Amino acid sequence: MLNLAWGESMNLPKFLPYFLLVGLFSVLFAFNAHVLKAQTVSLDHDGQHDFDFEIGTWKTHLKRLLHPLAGSSQWVECQGTTIVRRVWNGRANLVELEAHCPSGNFEGLSLRLYNPQSHQWSLNFANANGATLGQPTIGEFKQGRGEFFDQETFNGRAILVRFVISDITRDSCHFEQAFSDDGGKTWEANWVADDTRMKD
């Protein structure tokens, strides 16, 4: 400890290295505390349970654009039921959709898998007609909104696909798929669904 007698004058050049050393340690301590706090926040929210809100049975109102990226405005509306089941303690879930459309019944399935290394989800969709999983959209939730992207070929064109989950409450949520053929500058929605939880 630095101890100066009353009335004794301080020789600043003599004690300058001491003050510089104290200041340096203070800065390093504050920086390390900030990094540790950021790491703790990141570990606390790893995203594994981001889809827990959706577990259960939902009434689904679905709209599909019949001819995406063709300048069309012809939509078809469907009514159906969505069932979401938790798998692997929340690290995956299985979605089953059955909808009644003007042209007949539509059945879809989505397998969602959580990657603990990247802290991201992959959404893998299939319908009963194709019976194979499509290209997964990959992304994460931030501030209550999920955004997932992938690149695909549609009618011979390279496109970007965006799938958004928003307006999440305990009893409702909104889904929207959109395509872009200009590198993400503009997006055209082609699949919109609103889910309302069905009471037990």
Tell me the role of every PLM-derived stretch.
Residues 1-9:
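Short, Lys/Arg-enriched N-terminal segments with co-localized hydrophobic residues
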Residues 7, 32-35:
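Short stretches within intrinsically disordered, low-complexity N-terminal or propeptide regions
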Residues 13-17:
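N-terminal Sec-pathway targeting helices
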Residues 18-30:
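Bacterial N-terminal signal peptides
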Residues 34-200:
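Hydrophobic small-molecule pocket/channel-lining residues, especially in calycin-type beta-barrels
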